[in-house]
Amino acid sequence: AIKQAEKPFVPIKIAALYKSDFVVVLSGDVARFENGLNIFEKGKADKIIVTAGKTPWEKKIDSDGHQYIKIAAQRGIRSEKILITDVVHNTEQEVMEIRKMIPVESKLTVVTSAVHMPRAKMLFEKSGFKITPFPIKFYLGNKITPMSFIPSALALHRSSKIYREFQGRFYYWLKHLL
């Protein structure tokens, strides 16, 4: 299931990227933001877009994106170089908000997890964008050892991430089918 979830993406080195107008960081994991910031700092994007993702059941005051903007400021990123969407609750809303902010012809590098990238790419393309995917956090690279067959919190976490991703893909497949 993991292989299917991450297919067809492979890890990419920042040096191999072409320069884009924006590096887009989808909410959900600070590692996405760190990678997006590295892409920007290495001169591979003119600006950063972070999404103000916040799941409805979260009690936190700030969205992921608002926290990322604070981190960027602490790292010396000028405020005019980083954009943030309105609050969003899912990947489709992230894409719709970005579509309102920038021309569809913009060159985008999109940073998200490898298991999430197929769905994110599909939604960006359905919205008219052509993107360069920058997938991170691959699960497939892990070696199988005898410990792999012992139940663990990490295995449960990975299984739930993959299950949630397939649920999301099925939902959007069905939505766009009807």
Residues covered by each model-derived region:
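A structural signal for short, hydrophobic/glycine-enriched beta-strand patches
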Residues: I2-A155, S159
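A transmembrane-helix-recognition feature enriched in membrane-embedded lipid enzymes
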Residues: R158-L178
